[in-house]
From Swiss-Prot:
The gene is lpxC. It catalyses: a UDP-3-O-[(3R)-3-hydroxyacyl]-N-acetyl-alpha-D-glucosamine + H2O = a UDP-3-O-[(3R)-3-hydroxyacyl]-alpha-D-glucosamine + acetate. It comes from Pseudomonas paraeruginosa (strain DSM 24068 / PA7) (Pseudomonas aeruginosa (strain PA7)). Signal peptide: none annotated. It is an enzyme of class 3 (hydrolase). Its cofactor is Zn(2+). This is UDP-3-O-acyl-N-acetylglucosamine deacetylase. Keywords: Hydrolase, Lipid A biosynthesis, Lipid biosynthesis, Lipid metabolism, Metal-binding, Zinc. It comes from the Bacteria. One of its GO terms (cellular component) is membrane.
């Protein structure tokens, strides 16, 4: 049986929020079977818990934000991407502020934290959502699609008319039956343009952003001294974001996601369209792990 998975131990980290610039303490804790990923604002009294579910997404400007009443948790996508990539079904994420720390702008530090805490299999079958037929959403020239696929695959294309992007790969497709999330995707950092930063800061966004936690691009070049981690790091980060956004379904996915210039808003719209179309998906479990199409979820393939 493919079993649900949580953390073996509690682990903590400190960082700053990308958009708020606030210092934040992060604690990842094990959680019981069928809990899902739950964000907990421990700076509030009483503590407010917000499950990482598509229907709890309230804002999608520059990041994915979970909302419950007037309480928010910003920038959940990179941590959720790491949870998805390592197959963590159940965990509590405690935060001392309203935003998940940006760390280095990728999912790599979260992968390291989760692996350091250890993975614990639980005595219940892991539930997967299997895509049964195509579901798509569009907005202008942007598009996001789910299609049936016997495994988990994410394809993405970006289209930036900019000197830094013109000579680089702007399309990537990652089939996780043959590709390691940790090695090939998790280290891709978020990116931003110098020309946008002043405006973003006037909107109280990107207040914690720097070359320490993002790829910063000016009119002609990448400003980070060390350059890029992957030749296709820009589009790989969009894949990382999409994996985090898709994990708001609450379960690992069996199917393919295709995005063209899609962002957090359209990704969430796609999840809501899928959930509403009950004939387009089903929940499945695997009594025999050998029959499962997703191998990267198993502990040996997680590293």
């Amino acid at each position: 049986m493919i079993k649900q998975r949580t953390l073996k131990n509690i682990i903590r980290a400190t960082g700053v929020g990308l958009h708020s610039g606030e210092k934040v303490y992060l604690t990842l804790k094990p959680a019981p079977v069928d809990t899902g990923i739950v964000f907990c604002r421990t700076d509030l009294d009483p503590v407010v818990e917000i499950p990482a579910r598509a229907e709890n997404v309230g804002e999608t400007t520059m990041s994915t934000t979970l909302v419950k009443g007037d309480v928010k948790v910003d920038t959940v996508e990179h941590l959720l991407s790491a949870m998805a990539g390592l197959g963590i079904d159940n965990a509590y994420v405690e935060l001392s502020a309203s935003e998940v720390p940006i760390m280095d702008g990728s999912a790599g530090p979260f992968v390291f934290l989760i692996q350091s805490a250890g993975l614990q299999e639980q005595e219940a079958a892991k539930k997967f959502i299997r895509i049964k037929r195509e579901v798509s959403v569009e907005e202008g020239d942007k598009r996001a699609v789910f299609v049936p696929f016997d495994g988990f695959k994410v394809s993405f294309e970006i289209d930036f008319d900019h000197p830094v992007f013109r000579g680089r790969t702007q399309q990537a497709s990652v089939d996780f039956s043959s590709t390691s999330f940790v090695k090939e995707v998790s280290r891709a950092r978020t990116f931003g343009f110098m020309r946008d930063i002043e405006y973003l800061r006037s909107q109280n966004l990107a207040l914690g952003g720097s070359v320490e936690n993002a790829i910063v691009v000016d009119e002609n070049r990448v400003l980070n001294e060390d350059g890029l981690r992957y030749e296709d790091e820009f589009v790989k980060h969009k894949i990382l974001d999409a994996i985090g956004d898709l994990y708001l379904l609450g379960n690992s996915l069996i199917g393919e996601f295709r995005g063209f210039k899609s962002g957090h808003a359209l990704n969430n719209q796609l999840l809501r369209s899928l959930i509403a179309d009950r004939d387009a998906w089903e929940v499945v479990t695997f009594e025999d792990a050998r029959t499962a199409p997703i191998s990267y979820m198993r502990p040996a393939a997680a590293v």
